Amino acid sequence: MPTTNIKELLEAGAHFGHQTSRWHPRMKKYIFTKRNGIHIIDLEKTVVMLDKACNYINQVVSDGGKVLFVGTKKQAQEILAEEAKRCGMYFINQRWTGGILTNFHSIQSRIDYLVRLEDQQARGDFSRLPKKEAQKLGEEIARLNRTMGGFKEMTRLPDVIFVVDPIKEKIAMAEAKRMGVPLVAMVDTNCNPDEVDYPVPSNDDAMRAIKLICSKMADAVIEAQNAMKVTEVETTGEAQAETAG
């Protein structure tokens, strides 16, 4: 059964590409037509490509893998965080800090520092500090959480990265390629789909389109997680039955 349908994509405005003067020739196979100087994306192909991307995400999670959701453009920030939290995966929705993938050890030390500060705050250690110093540390926690809060529990490189806008996230894209982390991404008509392992042709500016695609990715994660729980329960039941027998 397809992940979505043309009607749902149309209602989200996923078919509207960029001005024809701002296109990438590699997107030609995903473009249906031109209308009023705008490229229109072929949603039949979007349905197929989204299905492939979601199946891949589902398989990665079924194998115990982790997904990192990335989208720092303003209209994607809140949506991306909501969907990543809904499926219990990592996210970056503010600024991509250079080295998150290529210098993960260094980034991990910053995360450890953040976690230590939060532990100290939770224990009430800050109350014993001068007011100004406690306030400064509180601000430091807030600052670090803005950039790292969405992935502070990530102890190794993610198994796949989902990106809302490859052009906006070019540093993340470059780091993923360098480290061999597969990429799933929404690709608008100004993007090069060849740079993505699992491209999903779609408007990447409209909030409704971003919400739709992000939610489908999260659904694919949740579906895999639920299937794993069922398998675990069945395995436990079989083991108990064998023991009882």
UniProtKB/Swiss-Prot annotation:
Biological process according to GO: translation
CDD domains the UniProt entry points to: RPS2
Alphabetically ordered keywords of this record: Ribonucleoprotein, Ribosomal protein
GO function term, MF aspect, one: structural constituent of ribosome
SUPFAM superfamilies membership: Ribosomal protein S2
PROSITE patterns with a match to the protein in the record: RIBOSOMAL_S2_1 (PS00962), RIBOSOMAL_S2_2 (PS00963)
Cystines in this chain: none
InterPro entries, per the entry: Ribosomal_uS2, Ribosomal_uS2_bac/mit/plastid, Ribosomal_uS2_CS, Ribosomal_uS2_flav_dom_sf
GO cellular component, one term: cytosolic small ribosomal subunit
Family classification: Belongs to the universal ribosomal protein uS2 family.
UniProt-listed HAMAP family: Ribosomal_uS2_B
Name assigned to this protein: Small ribosomal subunit protein uS2
Organism: Dehalococcoides mccartyi (strain ATCC BAA-2100 / JCM 16839 / KCTC 5957 / BAV1)
Source species taxonomy: Bacteria, Bacillati, Chloroflexota, Dehalococcoidia, Dehalococcoidales
Gene responsible for this protein: rpsB
